[in-house]
Regions:
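N-terminal secretory signal peptides and thylakoid transit peptides that target proteins
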Residues: 1-20
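C-terminal segment of N-terminal export signals and the immediately downstream linker at the start
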Residues: 24-63
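A short, well-structured beta->alpha microelement
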Residues: 30-32, 62-88
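Flexible, charged surface loops at secondary-structure boundaries
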Residues: 33-39, 86-93
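Long, helix-rich, hydrophobic modules that act as membrane-proximal anchors or helical bundle/coiled-coil regulators
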Residues: 107-108
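Glycine-rich, aromatic-bearing surface loops/beta-hairpins
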Residues: 119, 123-167
Length: 167
């Protein structure tokens, strides 16, 4: 059992820490910066089956930010990865959000880390191909930096990786 004086001391330290940094409790809990006004956002998807899931994800990202570029990775097509490589090496800070298949996500995350980018979040999901409402909300959530409800794994569903990086 914690001694009363020690508990009060720890509570005071915690409160002082938040006051000194000027952080609200909501910001402190997420630790993820939202897209700044005017910041470039790149939304990437993988064209695995060409269904509406990817389009809904991009639509959600576009509703949460003013400037959103979209790049669709066509398998292991070099032109899509070349565009990403160019963005990784420019001097402009870009928020990268994506809804990708496992293989594409592995490559993208390796490129981001190799270029010194920061992976802010990465989540694995098993979802139905027609979960467009969920995908749209995910796009909004990743761009805004909010935490969204995780989708439980569902057997027999498609595997996707949602990611949020600062490049």
């Amino acid at each position: 059992m914690m001694h009363t004086n020690r508990r009060a001391f720890l509570q005071t330290l915690t409160a002082a820490g938040f006051a000194l940094t000027g952080m609200g409790l909501a910001q402190a809990s997420t630790g993820k910066p939202a897209a700044a006004a005017g910041q470039e956002v790149l939304a990437i998807t993988s064209a695995t089956h060409g269904h509406a899931l990817e389009a809904a994800f991009v639509q959600g990202a576009q509703s949460a930010a003013a400037r959103v570029q979209h790049s669709q990775l066509q398998g292991f097509d070099s032109s899509s990865f070349q565009q990403l490589h160019t963005l990784l090496n420019d001097q402009q800070e870009t928020l990268l959000v994506g809804l990708l298949d496992d293989a594409s996500a592995t490559l993208v995350l390796d490129l981001v880390r190799s270029a010194g980018g920061r992976v802010l979040s990465e989540a694995h999901h098993r979802i139905a191909a027609d979960a467009t409402g969920w995908a749209q909300q995910l796009g909004q959530t990743l761009v805004s930096g909010q935490t969204g409800a995780a989708t439980p794994a569902q057997p027999g569903r498609e595997s996707r990786v949602a990611l949020r990086c600062l490049i």
